[in-house]
Amino acid sequence: MEYMDVKRAAEVWLLSERRITALCRNGRIVGAKKSGKTWMIPDDTKKPLDGRTREYASANEQDASVAHTTTRYTTEGATGKVVDAFENTYLRAPEHVAFTPYRICPIGAHSDHNLGKITGFAINKGIHIAYGPKQNGVIEIASLQFPKRAQWHVASTPSVKQDDWADHLRGATIALNKRYPLRTGLCAIVDGELPIGGLSSSAAVIITFLSALSHMNGIKLTERELIDISMEAENQYVGVSCGKLDQSCEVYCRKGHLLYLDTKDDTYELIPQHPSMKPYKIAIFFSGIERTLAGSAFNMRVDEARSAAYALKALAGLPYGKFNETNLRDVPREIFEQYKDKLPKSWAKRAEHWYTEFDRVQKGAEAWRRGDIEAYGKLSFESGRSSIYNWETGSPELKKLYDIMTETDGIYGGRFSGAGFKGCCMALIDPAYEDAIKEKVTREYLAAFPHLEGKYSVHICESADGVKLI
């Protein structure tokens, strides 16, 4: 049998020598043998299929001559990046890669925490986690966005926040362990494709991690369980009073469909793109300023909306029960109209946004159903305006982006994406105007905020399916 050394294999396979050495050391290349300081690999070892994919031969642990299985991953883009990082960190190939898309919500913002309705999409950018098992129950995970590797045990996860990037994942471990006994840990690398802020990267990383951890423990979670456990981690451990908009979009969504969800009873519909609808793409305009949701005024806005509901019930003589179980969905619109002048101004504004957004969501779903993307886009612009004047969010940067979008040809509609304090704006655009839109928005935005050049960015995306194992 003829052999080639690691250097030659690297040239032939277009892989790094370090990666090939790691694969040999961990028995991932059948027939490889140590020779001095290098490894020798059989010449007939299966090579990459093409420039986009590669294969790793996994030898049977007891007998390397037994027929092997293969794990294939893309070598380009985000999947290849996280796989490379895993191999360079743990000196072996990952067993699996999980992916959860980011989400956008053109209409329905700030509604879910008061049991409103929402519309949304998943997009074809998101969070990847490359992972493999650790039989000792330890979770060891590193992020390509943050320094310092995090580590804890599935049976003794810290019960309080550690105030670092991995808190979302600790909370997810605790929430999952309440429902199912966890014995197997994992080693993992997590990577996000876009800057942080406005696309629900926090929910996406939790869902991706839960998919990986449950998979390693032989647990098959339903879509509803995945949403509920993810939301519990963010609410109870991280301390963010979010609803289920983010998680639902990232789990339920399907490419080419609009998610129409009622967060009161969790019923939803995936409305397909009408055959006569004009073409569209999704543009993400990052302001260049990132934000941390739990440290923002997000929770205060949620409390103000709930306070409005509680006060309206009291003013109308309705049973109002516990404060944390009160929501605007249980208060008829006519009661709000009758008593809104008696509410503190900020409370009335929060409620005004919620009720008008509820109407916009229903109108938007019908517009999408009949293929009228221009009407849907107009409602998204109205949603953005209400977020500024009634929900009272929006940094100077996001407000400027919003104003530019409303005056740009080829943009059907858009608004802040996410909480609306920093982060990004999203827009539904006519692909025929893509280049002109990018040029105009970029030029006018950087003219207003020249110090953000190099931080501001534009990304053109498409709708996508929800969470999946690759």
Where is each model-derived feature located?
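A short, Lys/Arg-enriched interface patch at domain edges and termini
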Residues: D43-H68
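Beta-strand segments within the central parallel beta-sheet cores of soluble alpha/beta enzyme folds
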Residues: E140-A142, G185-G192, L221-E234, G377-E382, ...
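Alpha/beta catalytic cores of group-transfer enzymes, especially the acyltransferase/condensing modules
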Residues: K220-Y268, S417, I460, A464-D465
